[in-house]
Amino acid sequence: MQRRKFLKNAAAASAAFSIVPSHVLGKMHVPPSDTLYVAAFGVGGRGNGVIQGLNATGRVKFVSFCDVDDRRAKPTYDLFPNVKRYKDFRKVYDEQLKDIDAVMVATPDHTHATIALPFMREKKHAYVEKPLTHNIHEARLMTQVAKEKGIVTQMGNQGASSDDSRIAREWVESGVIGKIHTIDCWTNRPVWPQGVPTPTQKDRIPKELDWDLWLGPAAMRDYNDAYLPFKWRGFWDFGTGALGDMGCHIMETPFSVLDLGYPTEAEASCTTVWVDDFVEADYSHSCPPSSKIHLKFEHEEHGDIALNWYDGGLKPDLPDELKDGETIGDTGGGTIMYGDKGTLICDTYSRNARLLPSNMMDLYKSPAPKYPRIPGGMDGHIANFVDGCLNGAATSSNFDKAGRLTETVLMGNLAVQAYQYKELKPGKTARDWDPYDSPGRRKLLWDGENMKITNYDKANEWVTRDYREGWELK
């Protein structure tokens, strides 16, 4: 039954009992129905998992599903055959805005802000998959709007709700590893093609796909099977590469532990692809096969902190304290935090936090829990959002925190794009280009408050993007 009809029928049935949308009463009030009315955007793939997580709370009613690709959306449509379906998010806004309490956005990275912001401006709560946005400007804007409108927000980096993330913070604050000076993070991604040429062939658009809507704010181009499904992550116009995919999961621990602000410096190096003898490929529209990124933070308590990121098969050196046969991280990646008294390591999603050398775990007595645990831990991340919307509970990854984390991830990508950029001098060809004399291959100095690179102006073009006409941010 559609919610509008339900409200009408309920009002007619009883004047003593009514169902009131939670946004009418405010986020600190529980509606009599204790139900959150959600519109979901991007319901295939990861979106299907989030939808099932929302449904499992028993406190969510889906007002509508919106997806541009019926093939990817089919499993969700089959599970919820009675939920109204859309392809264009703007029609959801026009037709169902008043019936919605919250939105869930799990579309490709380049459309997160485009879809979420209009609803956020109307005080709709927002659950948005990681990374929060496609570029730094969007992340800052999402953070500001969330604060201005006083809405409940959550980014989909579920490790933020884990017990281990809180345990790690309590350990560090107890002083057991001293002042942190270096952090190493790594992932096994990409597990999709990167370092590839821009597709030029025009393939047939699948009848179930609205290609124009899928492109959204990105420039129009011919459809090619190289983009879908999932492989869009490896193209800068749509995705954010290995770092964008996993950085918000793996960097979650140091961000939670240290409450990091904006980085002040960023520097990158990437795998080189060669297309001829001594001729480096210009695949700058594609994220590189692998990269190493160095970020610097200034921290009031710990001093200067270096955060190093590795992807595409690259990994940091093993800690000296590691015994022969001991491993670090898991198959997806991990984090090492070096202090002047010891070392803390954890797996992907902040799991399995532990101290090195390993005998420290036997000798150390953990402090009493200081930070509230989320019921269900990492598995309770989605329910934590619902609880925030209905009961005013604090969410683990609100946009104030998630925005800064996303900006840091995207700052690393900005350094990668600067490294990839080939600035040819007039009259020169790719064979004349000297990679060791490239102005983008430098340490970039970042003014976080003003969102500006101060020593390489070209890189400021990647702080935002060119939006296709008609798709500008609302």
Please report, for each region that a protein language model flagged, where it lies by residue:
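Beta-strand-loop-alpha-helix segment that lines the small-molecule cofactor/substrate pocket
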Residues: 108, 113-161, 175, 441
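Short amphipathic alpha-helix with an adjacent loop that forms part of the alpha/beta core around
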Residues: 91-98
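N-terminal Rossmann-like dinucleotide-binding module
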Residues: 13-80, 159-162, 172, 254
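Glycine-rich, aromatic-lined ligand/substrate-binding cores of catalytic
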Residues: 202, 207-394, 398, 404-424, ...
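Rossmann-like NAD(P)H-binding beta-loop-alpha module
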Residues: 164-210, 214
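Short acidic-hydrophobic, aromatic-tinged amphipathic segments that line or gate anion-handling sites
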Residues: 84-88
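N-terminal secretory signal peptides and thylakoid transit peptides that target proteins
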Residues: 1-14
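N-terminal Rossmann-like NAD(P) cofactor-binding module of classical short-chain dehydrogenase/reductase
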Residues: 103-104
